[in-house]
From Swiss-Prot:
PANTHER family noted in UniProt: 60S RIBOSOMAL PROTEIN L7, LARGE RIBOSOMAL SUBUNIT PROTEIN UL30
Entry protein name: Large ribosomal subunit protein uL30
Keyword S-adenosyl-L-methionine listed: no
Organism: Pyrococcus furiosus (strain ATCC 43587 / DSM 3638 / JCM 8422 / Vc1)
UniProt superkingdom: Archaea
Transmembrane segments: none
Subunit structure: Part of the 50S ribosomal subunit.
Length: 155
């Protein structure tokens, strides 16, 4: 089971109620926030409902490790460190990220980790309109493995 990275692209003005509720269930309350979800039919249905406000794709272990190391926060807004992960789980951030991507562990297995990653806007911009789908040269919707490039630019 793959893990999907979901990033909110568009803001909250004129969002229809069902879409707003779906974004709230995904914990995507603000622009440039990212969450990691499972590749299950229920989540895929939620992503399809909110596809005009988000982008998503399969995240790899290397990008997830960078995301946790650079943007991961613990309760109290403390950064996630190698020492903390080693103390709680007995492994490095890279090993933890690999197990999360493979489905052996979940992000919830790391105690006190906040589920939302707050990212910067991408360096170089979104390379097109924020209002069109990725297939049409925009920024929205499913983008597959290219989500890793976008996350790298947003770290």
């Amino acid at each position: 089971m793959a893990k999907l990275a979901v990033i909110r692209i568009r803001g909250r003005v004129n969002v229809k109620r069902p879409v707003r509720d779906t974004l709230a269930m995904l914990r995507l309350h603000r622009v440039n926030h990212c969450v990691i979800v499972d590749d299950t039919p229920s989540y895929l249905g939620m992503l399809q409902k909110a596809k005009d406000y988000i982008t998503w794709g399969e995240i790899n272990a290397e990008t997830l490790a960078k995301l946790i190391r650079k943007r991961g926060r613990l309760i109290g807004n403390k950064p996630v460190t190698d020492e903390y992960v080693k103390e709680k789980l007995g492994m490095t951030i890279e090993e933890f990220a690999q197990k999360v991507v493979n489905g052996e562990m979940s992000l919830k297995d790391l105690p006190n980790l906040k589920p939302v990653f707050r990212l910067h806007p991408p360096r170089g911009g979104f390379r097109g309109s924020k209002k069109r789908s990725f297939k049409e040269g925009g920024a929205l919707g499913y983008r597959g493995e290219k989500i890793n490039e976008l996350i790298e630019r947003m770290l």
